[in-house]
Amino acid sequence: MRILQACAEIFPLLKTGGLADVAGALPPALRALGAEVRVVVPGFPAILAGLVDAIEVARLEPPPAMVMARGARLLYGRLPACDVDAYVINSPDHYHRDGGPYNDARQHPYDDNHLRFGLLGWVAAKLADGLDPYWAPRVVHAHDWHAALAPAYLRALEWARGRRLAGSVYTVHNLAYQGFFPAHHFGDLGLPAAYNQVHGLEFYGQISFMKGGLYFADRITTVSPTYAREIQGAEQGCGLDGLLRDRDADLSGILNGVDDAVWNPAGDALIPATYTRRKLTGKAQCKATLQAELGLAEDPAVPLLCVVSRLTEQKGLHLVLQALPALIERGFQFALLGSGDAGMENEFRRLAEQHPTAAAVRLGYDEAFAHRLIAGSDLILVPSRFEPCGLTQLYGLKYGTLPVVRRVGGLVDTVADARLETLDHDATGFVFDDFSADGLIGACLRAKALFRRRADWLQVQRRGMQQPFGWEDSARQYLKLYQQVAA
């Protein structure tokens, strides 16, 4: 079956969050099951630099407002770093910018993001309409708000052609990021005027790309079963809960997986020493090396907490800031890798300066350091307000770094709380309910108590490391879904 994945970023060439990890891992997993998978991505410089054997498929003629001065071309080639065949939209005026993929150097969204990512959705739909005369997908799978207009453009093309072109699947990676734009930009997109209403993209006087994906896709997925239920309620529905309840029969949750080729302590070239769940001596070496690298007191008996995250309120990082003084006083160490809210960055930096042998902070993102940090820590904190799936807790499980998570979304689907009655059965981490510093502190203190009981700690650690969170099962679920929408 021919599958087209439409996404804005792909690991390892371009990554701002977990979307890139999924986009990089799902196509090879589907191919291993016999699917013929290609991706379509914007021509950001990092992606173009990774494209080999490129040929020009077409000169693009999208709706007039999307056309920039130098036009746009669709290239086809291979992204060896991602192990996938790819269509790349080569349009420098759209995608070659001084800032990041979505925001400028001052972290302000680009004024023409509706054009930049409308073009991505349009190209995905046109590929189902014969843009490449030698290959057309049976299913178009669009990811997050950036590609969300693909199902809308596909529906419009099918109406114009009077026949079905392809099935469509739309995946919500985070409902909070919807791709909102002023209503007057709708006319730039070249969609039928009838789509600019409540049964379409219109959202309280604006347009929402994500709403377009949710409304027009044949099937909708989220990245965990619990999140699929949560977003149908007002608290986490972000104003779209009514639409999601209406489409409940078409909505399902499929957990993200961990790419074993990237995240595997048994063969990870980015960590000081490899290890397995049966032989954990290498993890102790990773911890000692990390403590030395960060200037922390080199003591194996001190539990080391880590965070790898965007610094936002949604991720619960303000709770970490509130909890850390008490946790450090109670004998924990802490290390963070992340960036985001400027105020939080300053607060974490100040805390590390106040406790130089107990806390360390690195702002930004460094993939190699993320591996060293997770491998060398004892516990990884994911205290999110809401969490569609979460990947860092899965990396923690894989590396024997027990997760401390809040009972929401994909976190509750992937981490089983360690309590006396569960230690011998399914415990893999520590789960708390209250979205508060006290809730986080309580879970960390429970973790420290278990850390002191070495045999019980090892039992939970090894159980976590053997959890089956690879991509094969998730890919099978997606393939079954594709078969349904292609029928």
From Swiss-Prot:
The EC designation for this entry is: 2.4.1.21
- According to the UniProt entry, where is the signal peptide? none
Molecular function terms in GO for this entry?
alpha-1,4-glucan glucosyltransferase (ADP-glucose donor) activity; alpha-1,4-glucan glucosyltransferase (UDP-glucose donor) activity
**Pathway assignment:** Glycan biosynthesis; glycogen biosynthesis
Q: Which reaction does it catalyse?
A: [(1->4)-alpha-D-glucosyl](n) + ADP-alpha-D-glucose = [(1->4)-alpha-D-glucosyl](n+1) + ADP + H(+)
Q: Which GO terms describe its cellular component?
A: cytosol
The protein's UniProt keywords, in alphabetical order, are:
Glycogen biosynthesis, Glycosyltransferase, Transferase
The source's superkingdom equals Bacteria
Single Gene Ontology BP annotation: glycogen biosynthetic process
Where along this sequence does the record place binding of ADP-alpha-D-glucose?
K15
InterPro entries linked: Glyco_trans_1 (IPR001296), GS/SS (IPR011835), Starch_synth_cat_dom (IPR013534)
Enzyme class label: transferase
The record's family statement is: Belongs to the glycosyltransferase 1 family. Bacterial/plant glycogen synthase subfamily.
What functional role does this protein have? Answer: Synthesizes alpha-1,4-glucan chains using ADP-glucose.
Could you identify this protein by its name? Glycogen synthase
